[in-house]
Amino acid sequence: TDIGGGLDVGGGLRGGLDIDAKGPDVDIKGPKVGGDISGPDLDVSGPDLDIDGGGKKGKGGFGFGLKMPKFGFGGHGKGDIDVDADVDIERPDLDVSGDADLPSGGVGLDVGGGIGGGLGGGLDIDANGPDVDIKGPKVGGDISGPDLDVSGPDLDIDVDGKKKGKGGFGFGMKMPKFGFGGHGKGDIDVDADVDIERPDLDVSGDADLPSGGVGLDVGGGIGGGLGGGLDIDANGPDVDIKGPKVGGDISGPDLDVSGPDLDIDVDGKKKGKGGFGFGLKIPKFMDPTFGFGGHGKGDIDVDADGGVVIPEGDIKVKTGKPDIGGDVDLPSGGVDLDVGGGIGGGLGGGLDIDAKGPDVDIKGPRVGGDISGPDLDVSGPDLDIDGDGKKKGKGGFGFGLKMPKFGFGGHGKGDIDVDADVDIERPDLNVSG
């Protein structure tokens, strides 16, 4: 009798002749890679301003001018926070082979490589391939950009102007261009390169059973398993392979940059035709070194008028490729069964043959992690302004507040770019049994 068919994922062989040939149990676990790769905690806050100005009376005027200096951390220099972690773990090239040879007898079974196969008939043959449990590495980690807290200055301004006459009261405050801008280049670069490959492993086991009523030849692979009335049990070795555990914490520095606290109390008294004038001008608040603008290179990348760029996290994880194949050969006898490879198909007939492929548990590596941009807290200045103008006459009271260009905008390039490149390849696995 000649039976040929496609291979089924599953299936089994059953019959009155009981032959049980089991390949090796193979349990392969890749390394666990855990880590915390985080950029710096960045806290940048502008100055706290508390200004109290009072001006009184007469034809004259009161003038107050406050001009903040260029308050910066920089220059044209180059500064960067660079966290570079290179982890290289090599996986095994795994070669597991087990031979179970039963010489010729009444039944001949030839199972080509595949993932199973299902045939039914009156003769009960149970062929089980090896149990293969392959687990890739667990890669867990927390890759996060910096915690960025950027806040403008706290402003508390109390202005009281009382006046008689033709003059007027005027208040003007002009905030600066307070932004993270400029033409410079800045970045926080967290580059984590994880390359995981398994070690070379060669496990072989031979089980030879002399001639009898059934001929069984089990080549390597993920296929095969025979059972019948004649009890033959050939077990390959149990193989348990665990890769190394790699854990780490890679974190950038905590960076806290804060401007000065400014408390200004101004009282101006004057007589004359003029009026009362108050002017607050804060300069351009830049920091090229730390990325707050300017033309320099500053490598905490808050780029181009407030562009906030998360560190480009580049994470690469590589593992090897499995190569699993096998042949189960039973020499010729009363029945000749040839099952070709494939992932489908099942044949049924009066002859009960149940061919089971191996229990194959292949788990790729678990790549877990938290890849998140920074906790970004950007707040404009807190403004507490109390202006009281009382007046008699033709004059007027004027109050002007002009907020700056405060934002993450402009023509520059600002993005949150988290680039995680995970390249996972299975180990070179050669299992034959």
Swiss-Prot record:
A motif (Nuclear localization signal) lies at residues 266-274. Residues 423-433 have a biased composition (Basic and acidic residues). It comes from the Eukaryota. It is a peripheral membrane protein. Egg cortex. Sequence repeats lie at residues 112-122, 219-229, 340-350. Keywords: Developmental protein, Endoplasmic reticulum, Membrane, Microsome, Nucleus, Repeat, RNA-binding. Residues 366-389, 411-433 are annotated as: Disordered. Residues 112-350 are annotated as: 3 X 11 AA repeats of G-G-G-I-G-G-G-L-G-G-G. Its main location: membrane. It is found in: Microsome membrane; Nucleus; Endoplasmic reticulum membrane. One of its GO terms (cellular component) is endoplasmic reticulum membrane. GO terms for molecular function: RNA binding. InterPro entries: Myelin_sheath_structural (IPR052082). May function as a multidomain RNA-binding protein. May play a role in nuclear RNA processing and in early development. PANTHER family: LEUCINE RICH REPEAT FAMILY PROTEIN, PERIAXIN/AHNAK. This is Vesicle-associated protein.
